[in-house]
Amino acid sequence: MHILMKCLGNKINDFNHKRVNDYIKDKLEIKDVLFRGLTIEEVLSYKFEVNKRIKFKRITSFSSESHIAETFAAERYMTNVLIVLKNANIFDYSTAMIEILENLIAIEESGQTDDDKLNKLYDNLSIVDYEREFLLPISSELTVKNIYFDNKKNMHIIEME
């Protein structure tokens, strides 16, 4: 099984964080703007301040779709805190996983397989494509550039580079 499959759905353990990090660290690209809804643990532990450098302790996911991150911030984590990340060196998880899943689907469709397994692959493909996820490697350092409240979104925004 490909190591990136460990990232589907659930949080991965520390051992797999290192394995995924080893895989992605040499496959980074610059992405203009990405978004992340923050958990309460992240809000409390990182203590965001303008000009402060923050080192992320584990692989951290971002989306290229602001509405995805806003939904996580407001509905799942209930923090209403959003990171807007600019010009980051990051791994394009969605594109890599779409390729892996499409290859698995092709293999399954060419042989005898049960519908449940194939349906699960299609479900995962749909989720990965929808979330447009990117992964920031372990120990990445970013600088807080600005913090403000966006009344229209009802979100605290933390701009980082």
Predicted regions and their residues:
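Mono-ADP-ribosyltransferase
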Residues: M1-E161
